[in-house]
């Protein structure tokens, strides 16, 4: 992999985690106004609808004929549909498990346990015979320790909410690995759009028959919905898919876990929240893990 392309992928994933981390306030406000399926479903549709004109603009600028699929090759179109469906289903399951589990545990514990996908990914990699270097294992361990210091401020015990969120972390790990499998085969913007159409459609039955949000609640939440739909879904997740094309999955997972670091830093910078030495130490460890993950393996 060319160093220039690797750097490009790192920048994309950093931007992705930055957007996710700084979007925490908007998502919290939206969650107070709408049920989890309503908020996630509507923002998914917004993300998909935002990406459709982006696809048209990109095609026009590159001189390609306007087409949602971007190809007449049935195999490439099949890869695109399969990738979008797989990633959309996985993302919906992970988001639902996270939202369910967080009702029974603290936000800090949920954040830490979710970030354990950085540990789960290399374990799953071994199952599919992917080579993981010693430095990558070290980076994963350091990043996990950093996430613990950032997210956990009280004693650690396990309850049913923690187990649900752990299941969410496993699904997120599979989601990241699925993106790695498809990102070399398909256009990232198109796959991202399909992913969010799938997320929205899977949420729709629950929105209609269970949560039944009032129009006044949706209009009251328009700003956090727009932010989460356009920034978190439309832009950030697309950056994730595009960035993973150039970065190995271990480094990608650590870069994506910076969401928690950026969330803490954003709270300190913009909301006047206190940043403890424990949290600062955790941030330093995660950044150190990023450097470790990029070190070459000794021959």
Language model segments and positions:
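Glycine-/small-residue-enriched transmembrane alpha-helix faces in small-molecule transporters
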Residues: 1-42, 88-89, 93, 97, ...
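Hydrophobic/small/kink-forming positions within alpha-helical transmembrane segments
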Residues: 21, 25, 88, 92, ...
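C-terminal-most transmembrane helix of multi-pass membrane proteins
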Residues: 2, 44-45, 52, 56-60, ...
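Helix-helix packing/entry segments at the starts of transmembrane helices
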Residues: 42, 110-116, 179-200, 233-269
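Transmembrane alpha-helical segments that form core, pore/gating elements
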Residues: 37, 47-51, 121-122, 157-211
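Specific transmembrane alpha-helical segments of multi-pass solute transporters/efflux pumps
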Residues: 23-24, 55-114, 149, 229-247
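Specific alpha-helical transmembrane segments that line the substrate/conduction pathway
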Residues: 38-49, 99-130, 168, 249-268
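Hydrophobic transmembrane alpha-helices of multi-pass small-molecule transport proteins
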Residues: 51, 132-152, 172, 203, ...
């Amino acid at each position: 992999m060319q160093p220039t392309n690797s750097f490009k992928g790192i920048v994309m994933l950093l931007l992705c985690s930055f957007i996710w981390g700084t979007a925490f306030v908007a998502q919290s406000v939206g969650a107070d106004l709408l049920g989890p399926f309503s908020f996630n479903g509507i923002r998914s549709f917004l993300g998909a609808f935002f990406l459709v004109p982006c696809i048209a603009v990109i095609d026009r600028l590159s001189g390609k004929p306007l087409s949602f699929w971007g190809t007449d090759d049935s195999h490439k179109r099949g890869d695109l549909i399969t990738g979008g469906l797989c990633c959309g289903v996985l993302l919906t399951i992970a988001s639902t498990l996270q939202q369910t589990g967080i009702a029974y545990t603290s936000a800090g514990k949920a954040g830490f346990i979710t970030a354990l996908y950085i540990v789960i990914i290399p374990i799953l990699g071994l199952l599919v015979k992917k080579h993981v270097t010693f430095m990558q294992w070290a980076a994963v361990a350091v990043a996990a320790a950093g996430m613990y210091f950032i997210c956990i401020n009280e004693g650690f015990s396990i309850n049913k909410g923690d187990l649900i969120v752990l299941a969410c972390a496993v699904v997120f790990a599979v989601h990241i690995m699925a993106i790695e499998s498809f990102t070399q085969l398909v256009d990232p913007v198109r796959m991202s759009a399909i992913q969010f159409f799938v997320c929205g459609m899977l949420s729709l039955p629950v929105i209609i028959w269970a949560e039944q949000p009032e129009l006044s609640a949706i209009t009251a939440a328009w700003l956090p919905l727009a932010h989460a739909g356009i920034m978190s879904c439309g832009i950030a997740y697309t950056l994730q898919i595009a960035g993973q094309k150039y970065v190995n999955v271990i480094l990608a997972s650590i870069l994506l876990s910076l969401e928690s670091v950026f969330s803490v830093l954003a709270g300190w910078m913009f909301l006047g929240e206190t940043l403890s030495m424990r949290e600062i130490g955790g941030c330093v460890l995660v950044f150190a893990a990023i450097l470790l993950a990029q070190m070459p393996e000794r021959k």
